[in-house]
From Swiss-Prot:
Molecular function GO labels: protein-containing complex binding
Protein name: Vacuolar protein sorting-associated protein 33B
N-acetylalanine found at: 2
Record keywords, A-Z: Acetylation, Cytoplasmic vesicle, Endosome, Lysosome, Membrane, Phosphoprotein, Protein transport, Transport
SUPFAM superfamilies noted in UniProt: Sec1/munc18-like (SM) proteins
Length: 617
């Protein structure tokens, strides 16, 4: 059932060191404010902080009370206030208001602001404008890498996607470069580097500068990770927009996995309480089903339950000594496994109920038709029906974006019709969201008469191929064209299978989308790793309209062991999905690699749409 790791698979580095470093730095910063203090924490730092330093650790370092940073001012009686926050102007104003309120009341306190993952000049400017810069001390908690699992690191920066890919804000690029620099300092240099995307290129260039400045630190170190591959999210929007059908992806789509854990409600726990569950390799049941297609999961869990019952039944024929050994050595483990099994069976039942209600099969059929380029009229009618029935506005928006990207933009008539129907169904407040989606290249309108293609053809006759490529790229950039259909053919993203695709024994990465589609991002990674360069992929890169690069340091590669050369760090800027993670884990098992994932945040289609939306749910 579950795909086992190959016996010759390389060992993963120990990333627990990253947690220890982050915890030690936070404790050091807290101790700079000696004595009892109240700690104000920004909402989206609470879950990451809990994975690093729980309440008992904070209490050991004289944190008295914990408060959540909210819109309204919180009253605290402590003489020392510490703020653990993201570098946001809104939050700086909140702190400034609190300090100014104390000043008006004639109250003298000490204030310390800890900004994570880095301090921005704009934040200090706001404090200065509000007249409190001299009253507070500002520090930086460079916490940018959180190990969510043995092979998954997250920067926990979900805003990265909107900030860069919509607003063009480059402030997080330094954070990415610093994170890569930390990894190369702790785990040795990366002999082979590949990347695609503008954000990736900027992050790589800045990281190389940091490496050159402190080269002496990693010189002579044996590399622990042989390859690093950096990829921008806008290289492949299609994969992120598709419904997920591997178990971990479905759990994320249905219940929202947050910072590596999920809240299972009463419908899953079969009690009147919700339960927060950590989803990682330590959960033995979950680790066996996380990468599986959902159609296989129920059968596996049923068999697991029967095996577990058989182990319990062994007690009947035991003598006292055997029973004593059973209780001391096995019973605790069996009870834990039984608890986890019950939870995952409950989660599966809940997913099935929700998906049956949504007519999930019809939805998947429509998505597959869009990916393959068949029955586009029928698919458009399905989306219109979706909008008319006022199914989730996010879901309708996602399908419109998938139609747009796979068709290289909507024809003007369809664009106007779908947009009008959407605004009438869900409200005119969504108008700005359409503007955002257009700017990001997610939902676009084809140029009438395909004017750009005609101009490109004329240009290509007048200049050399190389220059024509550059000018064509410029036109493509203006039009935000996806070229998905052409890329799909070049990279064979739609497998041609005789008969039914066997999801129990998958033949390729397409199993993560029921055999209908190989994730574009994963196929690019596979092709580049096979070639050890971008050679032979020039046309694909041109169609993607992205910067690409490859760099090999032979001196470092010579020092690397054969095991480390089979370890590949994949960096997703703008977020990655659990489907992509499952697909690359499968590829690793097939080819003898082991993939490690670093992402700005784990994402899915709903989070992608919410990031673009101007209407907050």
């Amino acid at each position: 059932m579950a795909f086992p790791h190959r016996l010759d698979a390389p060992e993963l580095p120990d990333f627990s060191m990253l947690k220890r470093l982050a915890r030690d730095q936070l404790i050091y910063l807290l101790e700079q404010l000696p004595g009892k203090k109240d700690l104000f924490i920004e909402a989206d730092l609470m879950s990451p902080l809990d994975r690093i330093a729980n309440v008992s650790i904070l209490k050991q370092h004289e944190v008295d009370k914990l408060y959540k940073v909210e819109n309204k001012l919180t009253l605290s009686s402590n003489e020392q206030l510490c703020f653990l926050v993201r570098p946001r102007i809104k939050t700086m104003r909140y702190i400034a208001n609190l300090v100014n309120a104390d000043k008006l009341a004639g109250r003298v306190r000490k204030y310390k602001i800890i900004l994570s993952p880095q301090k921005f000049y704009a934040c200090e400017m706001v404090l200065e404008e509000e007249g409190v810069y001299g009253d507070v001390s500002c520090d930086e908690w460079a916490f940018s890498l959180l190990p969510l699992d043995v092979d998954l690191l997250s920067m926990e920066l979900p805003e990265f996607f909107r900030d860069y890919f919509l607003e063009g804000d480059q402030r997080w690029i330094n954070t990415v470069a610093q994170a890569l620099h930390l990894l190369s300092t702790l785990y040795g240099p990366f002999p082979n580097c590949y990347g695609i995307g503008r954000c990736t290129k900027m992050s790589y260039d800045l990281w190389r500068k940091l490496e050159e400045e402190e080269d002496s630190e990693t010189k002579g170190r044996r590399p622990e990770i042989g390859h690093i591959f950096l990829l921008d999210r806008d290289v492949d929007f299609v994969t992120a927009l598709c419904s997920q059908v591997v178990y971990e992806g479905l759990v994320d789509d249905t219940f929202r996995i947050k910072c590596g854990s999920v809240d299972f409600g009463p419908e899953v726990t079969s009690s009147d309480k919700s339960l927060k569950v950590l989803l990682n390799a330590e959960d033995k049941v979950f680790s066996e089903i996380r990468n599986e297609h959902f159609s296989n999961v129920f059968g596996f869990l049923s068999q697991k339950a029967r095996n577990l019952q058989a182990q319990y039944d062994r007690r009947r024929g035991m003598d006292i000594k055997q029973m004593k050994n059973f209780v001391s050595q096995e019973l605790k483990g069996l009870k834990q496994e039984h608890r986890l099994l019950s939870l995952h069976i409950g989660a599966c039942e809940s997913i099935m109920k929700k998906k049956t209600k949504q007519d999930f099969q019809e939805l998947i059929k429509t998505e597959h038709a869009l990916l393959e380029g068949f029955n586009i009229r029928e698919s458009t009618s399905y989306i219109e029906e979706h909008i008319d029935r006022q199914v989730s506005p996010i879901e309708s928006l996602r399908l419109m974006c998938l139609l747009s990207i796979t068709e290289n933009g909507l024809i003007p008539k369809d664009y106007r019709s779908l947009k009008t129907q959407y605004l009438q169904s869900y409200g005119p407040e969504h108008l700005l969201t359409f503007s955002n989606l257009r700017r990001a290249g997610l939902l676009t309108e084809q140029a009438s008469g395909d004017t750009l293609t005609a101009v490109e053809n004329k240009v290509s006759k007048l200049v050399t191929d190389k220059a024509a490529g550059k000018i064509t790229d410029a036109f493509s950039s203006l039009a935000k064209r996806s070229n998905f259909r052409a890329i799909s053919k070049k990279l064979n993203l739609i497998p041609r299978v005789d008969g039914e695709y066997d999801l129990k024994v998958p033949r390729d990465m397409a199993y993560v989308f029921s055999g209908a589609y190989v994730p574009l991002s994963c196929r690019i990674i596979e092709q580049v790793l096979d070639r050890r360069s971008w050679q032979g992929l020039d046309e694909v890169v041109r169609l993607l309209n992205c910067s690409d690069f490859a760099f090999t340091d032979m001196a470092k590669e010579d020092k690397a062991s054969s095991e480390s050369l089979r370890l590949i760090l994949v960096v997703f800027l703008g977020g990655c999905t659990f489907s992509e993670i499952s697909a690359l884990r499968f590829l690793g098992r097939e080819k003898g690699y082991r993939f490690i994932f670093l992402t700005t945040a784990v994402t899915n289609s709903a989070r992608l749409m919410e990031a673009m939306s101007e209407v907050k749910s």
